Amino acid sequence: MGEQQLWERVVGGHFVLAKRSFWPNFFSRLVARLQWNPMAIDLTPDARAWPELPDDRRRRLTTLLAGFCVAEDAVAEHLTPFADAARGAKLASQESLMAWVFFLQRRDEQRHAKLFDRIGSEVLGLPGDTPAERRAAARAYATPAVLELFEERLPAMAAEIAEGRTGLDEGVSLYHMLLEGVVFDAGQHALLDDLADGALPGVREGVERVERDERWHVGFGLRCLVETKPTADLLDDLLARAGEAAEAWGDAVPAAIRHESAHKVAHRLHVAGLTATRAVA
């Protein structure tokens, strides 16, 4: 038997590789439609309105916004090993193209980090002359669970992936399915509900844009999970940890939103054909 031909045709002496999957192109085109500038959002009305909000509301919003200051920087910093792992994985889609999509996602995360740094500086009034200094100040307001997830568990997972001790399946289970798909999902929806009255219009606009980006991030992570062919044990562990992830914000996120975000994991896995049982509300 001859060797498998890896190209579908030759054009001008160049080998044209067969298109193994439409998914990388799908996500790339989606990203192109979602571009926005975090520096263009006007936070002036928000800065004026912030001191006038009731104390309880400011405390709740500070917990969420400060948590995102910490978390968005962390997810931007620790995504590169995932792209490297995608290049070396055996996927249905072209591995190098899937790695490129991780790069596109990292650009999104960097944009989100800039937005929340602006909110921390211009609205919350966090002290510090640099993003790193303001992020250090934000840690005092973030919940212990958020700090543990994004400053301990995520960096540890990224290091294990970089060293080849953990696969892409475990990485996207934590990063895309739990941190983005549950923790971020719950925090963003709590913010959008709280700010539906227009009290902080610039913050709400920014969170809306971030939330739209995160939808494709989670979808991309789910696609990666499907293509890595995860074990039943990994999926069971993912489902078991969803509830814990939803509790990361504490009382800053209403119980109904926590419950809904946690159950989205089971729904996504079912829709993707990874599990046979639909989530029970």
Regions found by a protein language model. Name each.
Residues 1-281:
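Non-heme di-metal
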